[in-house]
């Protein structure tokens, strides 16, 4: 089965690579329209997936990731339309010039070819990834989690119908609908057909892909994100950022999971934090120094376990640790961070500059929420993933991250001397 999917995807990629920007946008508009026109089919499939997931005891955080509503589905369709408005990187000349030999040389952006994406209970990923791949002239093979099997099948069927109505092969966007995990291992060895693999899931999936894949892998998306509250931070303003970073949508990878508080501001900051977190329904996991102060406040507080500093809660839980200074905060982030998104709240611009220079994450913020690490917020459109590695792509992966380049030499029957 996968062999045939790979062949179909590779053949489709050749056709997609020849499309103009206008033709690709026309396809995306058709997909967006059909997602709305066929919304009832997709939402009914999703309702069945959610019901099964709830019966199987999935956490509320995972159920939130899985669930589609009419508003969310409309938002997904609108995101596809936004991709139409983005500049197409394909065909763009990056650099070049004329050599001494007279050969005119240029480096031009081209599609990667076929993208493979493995992801969990995030039905929006199906459309986000498909739209970005199509915009950049790439075919895509999707393998969603078993929890979203019906939703993904319904969504991909709608996309394929839209493709065929535009004269394009259904092989441009395909989904593996068999939940058998053995197929993941088989997919990881499809380097004959797949040019880049993007896993979007937990640490176990990323480890599996790194160890078994014969395809280049882009890893990331695991967000143990930190906010360091410096001693010069403005408490009221800092709390607004923390509430946003923790509670706006706790199930996302750019949500803050650990708060590091400078010891010199702790006495005045922690009582205010407790009040705010109580109002927001957040449970605080505090180290010994913070626990002593937080226990007298209104927020629910428990003693932090050492392993929780490495946890991506994806829920209304927040680690709180008192640190001695900026060096202590940076050391903690280096030990426990996932190089996703980290922030400092401060009025001391020297400390801010040190934090930016010394915290080696894909996105680093000064006096801003970690929630900004998102393709839409960065002006990249819907993102295919957030990469926390350094080669090929880093941070939110938009259109350019789904391209490579080729060298093109144009001569007049020019030969090398």
Curated annotation (Swiss-Prot):
Its main location: cytoplasm. GO terms for cellular component: cytoplasm. Its EC number is 1.2.1.41. GO terms for molecular function: glutamate-5-semialdehyde dehydrogenase activity; NADP binding. Pathway: Amino-acid biosynthesis; L-proline biosynthesis; L-glutamate 5-semialdehyde from L-glutamate: step 2/2. InterPro entries: Ald_DH/histidinol_DH, Ald_DH_C, Ald_DH_N, Aldehyde_DH_dom, G-glutamylP_reductase_CS, Glu-5-SA_DH, GPR_dom. It is found in: Cytoplasm. It catalyses: L-glutamate 5-semialdehyde + phosphate + NADP(+) = L-glutamyl 5-phosphate + NADPH + H(+). GO terms for biological process: L-proline biosynthetic process. Keywords: Amino-acid biosynthesis, Cytoplasm, NADP, Oxidoreductase, Proline biosynthesis. Catalyzes the NADPH-dependent reduction of L-glutamate 5-phosphate into L-glutamate 5-semialdehyde and phosphate. The product spontaneously undergoes cyclization to form 1-pyrroline-5-carboxylate. HAMAP family: ProA. Belongs to the gamma-glutamyl phosphate reductase family. This is Gamma-glutamyl phosphate reductase. It comes from Escherichia coli O7:K1 (strain IAI39 / ExPEC). The lineage of its organism: Bacteria, Pseudomonadati, Pseudomonadota, Gammaproteobacteria, Enterobacterales.
